[in-house]
């Protein structure tokens, strides 16, 4: 079972990815993790990627496709894999198809932007322990204070509203077109495309996912 998970940052992809991995025994392939592992292992592609990253440049699509092909040939991908954070753009999706990497299921978790802003900008973190709160969904007992230590809570830079909106804008510009792209691929019978309402409870989304991935 080869799966691509699409959705904006903060849509709840990570939680559902965890569910899919546990349920179906397939690994999650994140391009970031994959790059770090290849660099650490010192593979030819890893060394090439390191050179590019050390120069502060973006790793090319060709290089990433090479790494994906290398990674999915490993034993733990025998039953399939879950691609996370890739492809991000239509040229990457085209390159995957050109390299014979077929996908069984494309899953989109859809959450309106305003809901994502509310979710993410409401997060508060206790820097010392990593405990996470939310001003609406999981508030601390005392506003702005950690339940255990009473110390101040902080907002991660990634969760600040301006940053969240910027990341959403990039998602809509680069990745959202993939929704249409895979819709056409599915219409041609080459993959299955399903969209889920990510504003539902985690359990409800997981249940619907399971019924589609049977």
Curated annotation (Swiss-Prot):
Location of region: LID: 122-159
Cell compartments where the protein resides: Cytoplasm
Record keyword ATP-binding present: yes
GO terms for MF: adenylate kinase activity; ATP binding
EC number: 2.7.4.3
Keywords: ATP-binding, Cytoplasm, Kinase, Nucleotide biosynthesis, Nucleotide-binding, Transferase
Keyword Ribonucleoprotein: no
Residues reported in the UniProt entry to bind ATP: 10-15, 123, 132-133, 200
GO cellular component term of the entry, any: cytoplasm
Highest taxon listed in the record's lineage: Bacteria
This protein's pathway: Purine metabolism; AMP biosynthesis via salvage pathway; AMP from ADP: step 1/1
InterPro entries: Adenyl_kin_sub, Adenylat/UMP-CMP_kin, Adenylat_kinase_CS, Adenylate_kinase_lid-dom, P-loop_NTPase
UniProt binding sites for AMP: 31, 36, 57-59, 85-88, 92, 156, 167
One Pfam family in the UniProt entry: ADK
Renumbered residue ranges of the record's region NMP: 30-59
Enzyme class: transferase
Coiled coil (UniProt feature): none
Main location: cytoplasm
PROSITE patterns with a match to the protein in the record: ADENYLATE_KINASE
NCBIfam families tied to this protein: adk (TIGR01351), PRK00279.1-1 (NF001379), PRK00279.1-2 (NF001380), PRK00279.1-3 (NF001381), PRK14527.1 (NF011100)
Role this protein plays: Catalyzes the reversible transfer of the terminal phosphate group between ATP and AMP. Plays an important role in cellular energy homeostasis and in adenine nucleotide metabolism.
Subunit structure: Monomer.
Domain notes for this protein: Consists of three domains, a large central CORE domain and two small peripheral domains, NMPbind and LID, which undergo movements during catalysis. The LID domain closes over the site of phosphoryl transfer upon ATP binding. Assembling and dissambling the active center during each catalytic cycle provides an effective means to prevent ATP hydrolysis.
Protein's recorded name: Adenylate kinase
Gene encoding the protein: adk
């Amino acid at each position: 079972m080869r799966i691509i998970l699409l959705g904006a940052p903060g849509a709840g992809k990570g939680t559902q990815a965890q569910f899919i991995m546990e349920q179906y025994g397939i690994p999650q392939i994140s391009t970031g993790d994959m790059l770090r592992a290849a660099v650490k292992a010192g593979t030819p592609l890893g060394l090439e990627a390191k050179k590019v990253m050390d120069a502060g440049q973006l790793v090319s699509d060709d290089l990433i496709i090479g790494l994906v092909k290398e990674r999915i040939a490993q034993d733990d991908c025998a039953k399939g894999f879950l691609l996370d954070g890739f492809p991000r753009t239509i040229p990457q999706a085209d390159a995957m198809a050109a390299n014979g990497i077929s996908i069984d299921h494309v899953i989109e978790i859809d959450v309106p932007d305003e809901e994502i802003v509310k979710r993410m900008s409401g997060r508060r973190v206790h820097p010392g322990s990593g405990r996470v709160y939310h001003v609406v969904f999981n508030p601390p007992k005392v506003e702005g204070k950690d339940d255990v230590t009473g110390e101040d809570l902080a907002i991660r830079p990634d969760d600040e509203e301006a940053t969240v909106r910027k990341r959403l804008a990039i998602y809509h510009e680069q990745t959202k077109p993939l929704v249409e792209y895979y819709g056409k691929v599915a219409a041609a019978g080459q993959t299955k495309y399903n969209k889920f309402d990510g504003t539902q409870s985690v359990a409800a989304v997981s249940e619907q996912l399971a019924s589609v991935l049977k």
